[in-house]
Amino acid sequence: MPVQGSQRRLLGSLNSTPTATPHLGLAANQTGARCLEVSVPDGLFLSLGLVSLVENVLVVTAIAKNRNLHSPMYCFICCLALSDLLVSGSNMLETAVTLLLEAGALAARAAVVQQLDNVIDVITCSSMLSSLCFLGAIAVDRYISIFYALRYHSIVTLPRARRAVAAIWVASVLFSTLFIAYYDHAAVLLCLVIFFLAMLVLMAVLYVHMLARACQHAQGIARLHKRQRLAHQGFGLKGAATLTILLGIFFLCWGPFFLHLTLIVLCPQHPTCSCIFKNFNLFLALIICNAIIDPLIYAFRSQELRRTLKEVLLCSW
């Protein structure tokens, strides 16, 4: 994705020479000040991408194979897995091509590399946007299933879910193309940051409201069975811990990347901001880590999906 620092890694590798970079060390910024730079080895980056790729391929395969999983909720989960798959795959492709160019194993004209870089940028950006959208869609789906349980199947139908999925994909590709074309405009970067904050607020509000409703329900049961008061307290703590982990992982994995975009707008030349820009590859690695964690949170907790996945793996042998 075209941002400062590592945004033109493919194009820059045509004239670059490999240098030994420490995994964790101090690097000098433009003013000569020392700042902390965390380098992500290419091998680790590719390994994370491969793990994410395998996980999300398994999720998509299991949902496609089992007709019992062809419901709106699993439709959103499948599309989230597909988005995460594209995020990991596009970053792996860029890293692999870069390594081949740097090693001299792949010869290409600058114009060809530029076009390839643009295509990868669009895929990466659109898959990031769609991933955030599907995380929000899953939160909305769960909210409706709790607060409108009796009307859920009339509100969230499969045709509506498919239309929502199509709209998300089309909008993601369209806006990512515009973002890549006009990435050097501050308004474009601010739009991306505002979109991330909107998804964060949406998920936080919905999940907190769902937790409050669940605690109220557990409290009502505890009143009928006074002996279960301690169990109710434990449920509240467990729910709060789950919510903290869910939102915490989302913020920790996505937040640094959008902080990077924010600082490009606010302080592109400031020494402190320049230090943060040096860790762009780390921020991408965190997003890939989120793509690894998403199936664990949203997919593999389903007993039906795990059973189907087991059948798929056994059949493959």
Curated annotation (Swiss-Prot):
It is a multi-pass membrane protein. SMART domains: 7TM_GPCR_Srsx (SM01381). GO terms for biological process: adenylate cyclase-activating G protein-coupled receptor signaling pathway. The chain crosses the membrane at residues 38-63, 73-93, 119-140, 164-183, 192-211, 241-266, 280-300. Glycans are attached at N29. Residues 64-72, 141-163, 212-240, 301-317 are cytoplasmic. It is found in: Cell membrane. The keyword Plastid does not apply. The keyword Ribonucleoprotein does not apply. One of its GO terms (cellular component) is plasma membrane. A lipid is attached at C315 (S-palmitoyl cysteine). GO terms for molecular function: melanocyte-stimulating hormone receptor activity. Keywords: Cell membrane, G-protein coupled receptor, Glycoprotein, Lipoprotein, Membrane, Palmitate, Receptor, Transducer, Transmembrane, Transmembrane helix. Residues 1-37, 94-118, 184-191, 267-279 are extracellular. Belongs to the G-protein coupled receptor 1 family. Receptor for MSH (alpha, beta and gamma) and ACTH. The activity of this receptor is mediated by G proteins which activate adenylate cyclase. Mediates melanogenesis, the production of eumelanin (black/brown) and phaeomelanin (red/yellow), via regulation of cAMP signaling in melanocytes. Interacts with MGRN1, but does not undergo MGRN1-mediated ubiquitination; this interaction competes with GNAS-binding and thus inhibits agonist-induced cAMP production. Interacts with OPN3; the interaction results in a decrease in MC1R-mediated cAMP signaling and ultimately a decrease in melanin production in melanocytes. This is Melanocyte-stimulating hormone receptor. It comes from Papio hamadryas (Hamadryas baboon).
